[in-house]
Regions:
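Active-site catalytic microenvironments in core metabolic enzymes, especially phosphate/sugar-handling
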Residues: 1-221
């Protein structure tokens, strides 16, 4: 398999030019002498454990969501590519994949990272839906609200967007303490890992080939 052809499929949906200035999406390790790859592993984050598993499974390429800002020398025998904020912003990207997994049908684009579902639902019912993805989620409901009708979603770290829209509920993966204390909205912190791990299935769908999935688990118990 030509590694550049595979990456082109991802970049057609999540172009690199859309990444944030601080992001390091793209080729993390790109050995120009290696064009064809035999087996690919998909991972949320490339760690030592993920790298060793890829080697043990005879993978010669890893496609990950999170980029590496520093690359250990020993990783350089593995072709590594990441699509982080481009995939977060993309149509059917990280946040939209989360919404669809929850079986919400319609949503609107609030901004590059946030999608909004307009549907009246009880807080308890929404909590039960989210628990299917994140059993250990945290609920912030400072006003004891029982029903919401406009839900903002942002997979990953979305704390900065909680009060950026007129939604009355927000679902994200990381909520800062002081934001949680001060917000008037219903907020679900479902965990960074849980909110983004679903994107690996989307990567597989985009590539249209057999892949090896990493066995990553959330670091929080």
């Amino acid at each position: 398999m030509n590694k550049y052809s595979l990456v082109a499929k991802i970049e057609k949906i999540a172009p690199l030019h859309t990444q944030e200035a601080w992001d390091c999406s793209g080729w993390i390790v790109d050995n120009p002498d290696v064009v064809d790859v035999k087996k690919i592993m998909l991972a949320l984050t490339v760690t030592d454990k993920v790298y060793e598993l890829a080697k043990s499974k005879n993978c010669d390429m890893i496609i990950a969501h999170h980029p590496l800002f520093e690359v250990p020398i020993r990783y350089r025998d593995m072709q590594i590519y990441s699509s982080h904020t481009p995939m977060d912003k993309a149509e059917n990207g990280t946040t939209e994949t989360l919404i669809r997994r929850l079986r919400f049908v319609n949503f609107k684009i609030e901004n590059e990272f946030v999608r909004v579902v307009e549907q009246k639902i009880s807080v308890s019912e929404l909590k039960n839906k989210l628990k299917q993805i994140s059993p250990n989620l945290r609920l912030i409901n400072n006003n004891g609200t029982e029903t919401v009708s406009k839900i903002g979603f942002c997979a990953g770290s979305g704390s900065e967007f909680i009060d950026c829209g007129d939604y009355d509920c927000f679902v994200t993966g990381d909520v800062k303490y002081h934001t949680a204390v001060e917000t008037e909205k219903v907020v679900f912190d479902i965990g960074h890992f849980e909110s983004e791990i679903l994107i690996l299935d989307r990567f597989k769908e985009i590539l249209g080939i057999e892949v090896v999935m990493s066995d990553e688990k959330s670091p929080f118990i």
